[in-house]
């Protein structure tokens, strides 16, 4: 079945975002006291079973958690990749577009305010450089004027990020299996023996398979505080409320002033998305990594794990005069991986799913060249 024939399956996940246009949730401000809404999990203080349990509780109840002292990705790795990212965005826009042209079908290259969220129907106030881990996607998109070190460091950083993402997925799947076995007895145990290993369905740089993506993001400063306030009144966001398409996202944030603004729905399990508030996600802990569950993994686990809405609000006060930088590593299953559907629904491949979500997010752009290949 083609991606177009399967589009209604993708639409079910996009629908949550689209409803924000009329629900009023997208305009709500964040809770003043939301520090405890997103769990912080310290790898250094936990044994394996307790780590699995804490990760699963956070993933199933909030869909967001922050890792400290996590393996594979060190603070120095994050800082070094941010240095390359910031150098990339310092270049003239025309140079970025020429050196790294965006291709929606390949989900790779440089884009400037192209992403239109279903939740706002407005363009996000950002620019980004997307690296999808496939040689054919990147062969004409690595910025030659930045030298070979940019590509080499980015590949290494993506490799370390994937190892951490796979570890998180394995922990979550192991704990889910443990809990289902405890609830279901011997029959459930036999069923779980046949359950597929989701973590193993992720690769880098394998042609016609790999879909994992690193997105380096720059939210440009505004010319004045008043300009940011005016755009906020018109409904603009730095990134409109959305869920991610992947299995898990590793989000790397700068700690300096002006780099805040990331928020997630605070109590979606309790209140539903239509009635929840927003919770601020801390960005000030050096070396910390924010993780959220994506739609793929939520669908693969029949909704046991929560893919939570999140957004980047418009800056307030003097924040508006600062750039905001972040990086997101999207652990997306290989093209041929079949995403198990909810009971009674069809399955689809990870390739079909990603193409469907690209259409939903870039279909609103007026740039026909962007969408022609999708």
Predicted segments, located by residue:
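Peripheral, non-catalytic segments flanking oxidoreductase cores
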Residues: 2-374
